């Protein structure tokens, strides 16, 4: 439910950004504001609490961000406060980034490996993913020793699991079925 709501808000502000040719700028502003909220938990809690009126919260947003963000983003934050949706700002920013990538025909991918990938391996994986998806894929390497070996690629809702850990788990399951 929260993802659906966040998608609606992200889509709405993204459309405005596209119309004004400010979609990149809007993303940067939203990302910074969301980070500010995460870094300053007391302030973020204050924006979510019913103790302050919506008008007081909007005045706070106006005073803090009027010189740091575009009028459209400040007004967007005020709408989130009016609709009691400021708490999903992180989800909105994440979905906005996906919309921005789709608009630029880009996909973000995470390659999870047991050890850091070499530059050559990363380039080869990027090339293969670009070929597979017919999109411009940006791959980031994340190290997780629990995968043991191989690679787990996450792109949006899709996962390509070529890890040793998963192969061992499948083998274990097959052996249990044979023995049982």
Swiss-Prot record:
Molecular function GO terms recorded: proton-transporting ATP synthase activity, rotational mechanism
Cellular compartments per GO CC: plasma membrane; proton-transporting ATP synthase complex
Highest taxon, organism lineage: Bacteria
Compartment list: Cell membrane
Pfam family, one: OSCP
Entry keyword Ligase: no
UniProt keyword annotations, A-Z: ATP synthesis, Cell membrane, CF(1), Hydrogen ion transport, Ion transport, Membrane, Sodium, Sodium transport, Transport
A single BP term in Gene Ontology: sodium ion transport
InterPro entries for the chain: ATP_synth_OSCP/delta_N_sf (IPR026015), ATPase_OSCP/d_CS (IPR020781), ATPase_OSCP/dsu (IPR000711)
Predominant place of localization: membrane
Membrane topology designation: Peripheral membrane protein
SUBUNIT field: F-type ATPases have 2 components, F(1) - the catalytic core - and F(0) - the membrane proton channel. F(1) has five subunits: alpha(3), beta(3), gamma(1), delta(1), epsilon(1). F(0) has three main subunits: a(1), b(2) and c(10-14). The alpha and beta chains form an alternating ring which encloses part of the gamma chain. F(1) is attached to F(0) by a central stalk formed by the gamma and epsilon chains, while a peripheral stalk is formed by the delta and b chains.
Record-stated family: Belongs to the ATPase delta chain family.
Function in brief: F(1)F(0) ATP synthase produces ATP from ADP in the presence of a proton or sodium gradient. F-type ATPases consist of two structural domains, F(1) containing the extramembraneous catalytic core and F(0) containing the membrane proton channel, linked together by a central stalk and a peripheral stalk. During catalysis, ATP synthesis in the catalytic domain of F(1) is coupled via a rotary mechanism of the central stalk subunits to proton translocation. This protein is part of the stalk that links CF(0) to CF(1). It either transmits conformational changes from CF(0) to CF(1) or is implicated in proton conduction.
Leftover remarks: The ATPase of C.paradoxum is of special interest because it uses sodium ions instead of protons as the physiological coupling ion.
Name of the protein described by the UniProt record: ATP synthase subunit delta, sodium ion specific
Provenance organism: Clostridium paradoxum
Classification of source organism: Bacteria, Bacillati, Bacillota, Clostridia, Peptostreptococcales
